[in-house]
Amino acid sequence: NLNRTNWPKKIFNIYWNVPTYFCHQHDVYFNELTKFDIKYNPKGNYRGDTISLFYDPGNFPAMVPLKNGTYDIRNEGVPQKGNITVHLQQFTKELDEIYPKKISGGIGVINFNKWRPIFRRNVNNLKINKEVSIDLVRKEHPKWDKSMIETEASNRFEKSARIFMEKTLKLAKDIRNKNKWGYHGYPYCPTASTGNPSFDCDALAMNENDKLSWLFKYQDVLLPSVYVKHVLKPEEKIGLVRGSVKEAVRISKKFEHLPKVLSYWWYAYEDKMDTFLTETDVKNTFREILINGGDGIIIWGTMHDLNKEKCEKLKQYLSTILGPIAFKVMEAVKKRTPLNF
């Protein structure tokens, strides 16, 4: 029911995580974020007192795809072969160089997507991680059958993936303890596939998220991704957001510290990146985040979205559609009134 309303939470925040400093060279500024009650880093960069995003930090093992179809094997490629010390040393160095304590604070986001810690979830452009892992075991045990090899590969991969993700998070929390830390895109919930009328996470996905309790118990914030595709039907876009937020809230309630659920939301469509979400899609997705128990929205964008023309278009979009909707959400929160749009 697209017209349903609900009482919002007492505390809810909307954040701006777009590198709009890039627009300053074109004399385009986004000072109106303040009047729309959107929290942002004053310099318009990815890292500051309000929120800080770290892309592929440190030296995680990774099979980095190259344009010629081959891979750059970084830190031995897969976690079970990688050197954790080298990774953590590099991460510490990066934090010291680009994120000194004097500017630290707010939300700290680790964005690593070269593999997923659940072996089965390494599909499509991540399937190379499964292939390499299976090949390593096959070379060690050429007489084992396929099932034994895959089971052993999965066990080795997941055990080591946990070490890398867990120790990275603990290090961040230890040396930048003013931040509220979490991994971008977790918990993962592939909901809006055609043929899934409920849009809830399936039992297998929920079970796999439960297996990641070792990660979530250390996260201060849960950061599910709720980017939508233009090709989806309106109810599928709504369902994707609803399912992802509900799953993150379910995970949050498993822990005494109740990590906040802040959904990463992109103003462009995943499959049509030069097109902003329509006013209806913004309203529908924001509403779902709010009324299904979310604690906030992180509006995201990339430098690829920003040349002079795109900066001006984004500013116009913020002023006419995105900002006013965000303001209405925040007014409903502050006044404790139902959200009606």
UniProtKB/Swiss-Prot annotation:
Gene3D superfamilies: Aldolase class I (3.20.20.70). GO terms for cellular component: extracellular region. It holds the Pfam family Glyco_hydro_56. One of its GO terms (molecular function) is hyalurononglucosaminidase activity. SUPFAM superfamilies: (Trans)glycosidases. Disulfide bonds join C23-C311, C189-C201. It catalyses: Random hydrolysis of (1->4)-linkages between N-acetyl-beta-D-glucosamine and D-glucuronate residues in hyaluronate. It is found in: Secreted. PANTHER family: HYALURONIDASE. This is Hyaluronidase A. It comes from Vespa velutina. The lineage of its organism: Eukaryota, Metazoa, Ecdysozoa, Arthropoda, Hexapoda.
